[in-house]
Amino acid sequence: MERLILNKLLDWKNSPYRKPLILKGVRQVGKTWVLKEFGRRYYENTAYFNFDENEEDKQFFETTKDVDRILQNLMLASGQKIVPEKTLIIFDEVQDCPKVINSMKYFCENAPQYHIACAGSLLGIALAKPSSFPVGKVNFMQIDPMTFTEFLLANGDENLAKYLESVDTIEPIHDAFFNPLYEKLKMYYVTGGMPEPVLMWTEARDVSAMQEALSGIIGAYERDFAKHPNISEFPKISMIWKSIPSQLARENKKFIYKVVKEGARAREYEDALQWLVDARLVHKVYRSTAPGLPVAAYDDLSAFKIYLVDVGLLRRLAQLAPTAFGEGNRLFTEFKGALTENYVLQTLITQFEVVPRYWSQNNPPYEVDFLIQRENDIFPVEVKSEANTTSKSLKKFKELFPDKIKLRVRFSLDNLKLDDDVLNIPLFMADQADQLIGLALEQKNSKSSCRF
């Protein structure tokens, strides 16, 4: 299995400004495997410490701040060798170990020769607490579910993945690539990007095992809900979680608390929702009132949409059977195209630093699914789960903000093309959105300059 984050980890290793690393990511997204694989590939040896399996190791961080003494005790207790710059030290399951996290300050200041990477589930929750990590003394990195490109690599389709990465002009994709990529994307909707269900499919073609793996991950997340410090929030978190398919099945996907429970109010459930956001189990996309910078200045905090961390988990949570894979475009269009919208958001979050927003207006109603910030430009994005689509909302958006929009973007089942200032990206090329937007802008600017 190949994870593209390994390239980022190598950059971290070679950086002259390297600090201890905290790798964030949801449970079972592949944090431990990635760090161990990184150590295997690029270090002489790896020293691995799991504070959930060996809680007694926590004591070495509670009695001293001397990093040499801490490492000496860990080596004596575990029998593992630690050599500066040649050993990758992995501290796993650190979410309940504030002393371990805080010790990164001393490793950064007093022992930069040691290469340390920390990981843990629910780290977003732990790091949201005051004084839970040393500001400015650590590097952060986020690992998300496997992208469609990574799914192709895991499935043995290196040729398709390489082709997608090689596209350097905006022109239609040949049928020899378009059709198989379209079919592979449908399967990605079924498995999602969590490594275990992907493995069950790519290595064994075992649909039942893949389904069980997805159910197991969902069950693990639901058990984590009970870890909220205020136990009364547990049922609220659970109800919000289970309402997500219903929220996304609506024509207007704006999050409505009454869908969670009849009579529910924001003030009663907002803490529970924030827990899910901090855990990164869901993505919160605010409504923007206008395409301005900084984007946060134009947020309507009372209106937002909620998406799941992974499209495969959403399919399983919504109880959509894998057999939909063989039913034409059903996976793309089922419950108002929610799987497609969720999938596109996943890819945008991994490519763009600023979390996407969406835009809408009433009377008459128009909605642009996402607004993305690329450098200092805002691009409206529409997601269509079919081909031969029209973009009324994109047209309206340009009418309202003609001077702020260089390019409009549409994801659909249509082929790659640039029609005036509308870039159509096939859904299977969503991972290449940033690159394709750049190419489209160059092509558009080139045409404009040729007119003079």
Regions found by a protein language model. Name each.
Residues 1-16:
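Pre-Walker A adenine-sensing motif
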Residues 153-346, 356-363:
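Interdomain hinge/linker elements that couple catalytic modules in large macromolecular machines
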Residues 13-21, 28, 37-41, 271-452:
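A cross-kingdom feature that marks ATP-driven nucleic-acid transaction machinery
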Residues 90, 115-121, 142:
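Structural recognition of the conserved hydrophobic beta-strand(s) that form the central parallel beta-sheet
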Residues 31:
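Conserved lysine of the Walker
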Residues 53-84:
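Short glycine-rich substrate-engagement loop in P-loop NTPases that contacts/grips substrate
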